[in-house]
């Protein structure tokens, strides 16, 4: 009820013997209270809507990416299940993710339309958009190879989300470097991806932070702080990341932290 503030304001004014002007003041104060409460309720509703859309779109696009290679195999489904495990999805959340994955596999899935809708509810929150794209990149090469069709789908996603080819290619390099810190995959010379077999290098660490090995300490620290802020799990959830995906944000933040520690050690700064 959006008029309780007015009722309480008038009641308090009458109890205090405020007279006509006291009642008017009580109405005004109560109206302001009701308006603020209404805005707060609308914010929570929009937040839930944004999180629900992020969740559904994430798994729909995963399904679309998988189908872009051709027939969806048991191995593809197993990989999707592993990603759900990484997000600690169980019960209703897992069922919702599986249903969304199936929706995305449809031949007529409207990818561009879905991406425009997703971008509109993000309200320019680049960290949310970035997290979404990073999840899709992980899903695309989780089977050990980045199929040309998957790459084309990723290019469409990036384009509709306002990310240039240059930015996208940088994201790929950052994911490549991050694989050495998170037990994932690294890029082969042929353009595919394979499971990491070596330890992380200074170049890997710099790729994670999006810096060069020749950059100075100030530049590296600035990049590190920016990335940690953009991947802060609580901040991302507050902006619309579904709570179920907080674990992936934590894992990404850990990769960034490990990369930064390696850079500090090898370049000799604190």
Curated annotation (Swiss-Prot):
Protein localization: Cell inner membrane
Transmembrane segments: 7-31
Keywords, ordered alphabetically: Cell inner membrane, Cell membrane, Chaperone, Membrane, Transmembrane, Transmembrane helix
Record SMART domains: DnaJ
Cited function: Regulatory DnaK co-chaperone. Direct interaction between DnaK and DjlA is needed for the induction of the wcaABCDE operon, involved in the synthesis of a colanic acid polysaccharide capsule, possibly through activation of the RcsB/RcsC phosphotransfer signaling pathway. The colanic acid capsule may help the bacterium survive conditions outside the host.
Assembly description: Homodimer.
UniProt name for this protein: Co-chaperone protein DjlA
Protein's organism: Salmonella typhimurium (strain LT2 / SGSC1412 / ATCC 700720)
Gene designation per UniProt: djlA
């Amino acid at each position: 009820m959006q008029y309780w503030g007015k009722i309480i304001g008038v009641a308090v004014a009458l109890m205090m013997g405020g007279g006509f002007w006291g009642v008017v003041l009580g109405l005004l104060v109560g109206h302001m209270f009701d308006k603020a409460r209404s805005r707060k309720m609308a914010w929570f509703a929009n937040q839930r809507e944004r999180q629900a859309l992020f969740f559904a779109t994430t798994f729909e696009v995963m399904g679309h990416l998988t189908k872009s290679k051709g027939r969806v195999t048991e191995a593809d489904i197993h990989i999707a299940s592993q990603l759900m495990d990484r997000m600690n999805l169980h019960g209703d959340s897992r069922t919702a993710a599986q249903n969304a994955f199936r929706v995305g596999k449809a031949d007529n899935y409207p990818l561009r339309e879905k991406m425009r809708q997703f971008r509109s509810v993000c309200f320019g929150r680049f960290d949310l958009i970035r997290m979404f794209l990073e999840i899709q990149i992980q899903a695309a090469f989780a089977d050990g190879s980045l199929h040309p069709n998957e790459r084309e789908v990723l290019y469409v996603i990036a384009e509709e989300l306002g990310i240039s080819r240059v930015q996208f290619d940088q994201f790929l390099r950052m994911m490549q470097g991050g694989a050495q810190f998170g037990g994932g995959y690294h890029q082969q010379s042929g353009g595919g991806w394979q499971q990491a077999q070596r330890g992380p290098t200074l170049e890997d660490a710099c790729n994670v932070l999006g810096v060069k090995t020749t950059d100075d300490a100030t530049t590296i620290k600035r990049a590190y702080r920016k990335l940690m802020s953009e991947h802060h799990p609580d901040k991302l959830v507050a902006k619309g990341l579904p709570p179920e995906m907080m674990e992936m944000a934590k894992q990404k933040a850990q990769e960034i932290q490990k990369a930064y520690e390696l850079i500090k050690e090898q370049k000799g700064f604190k």
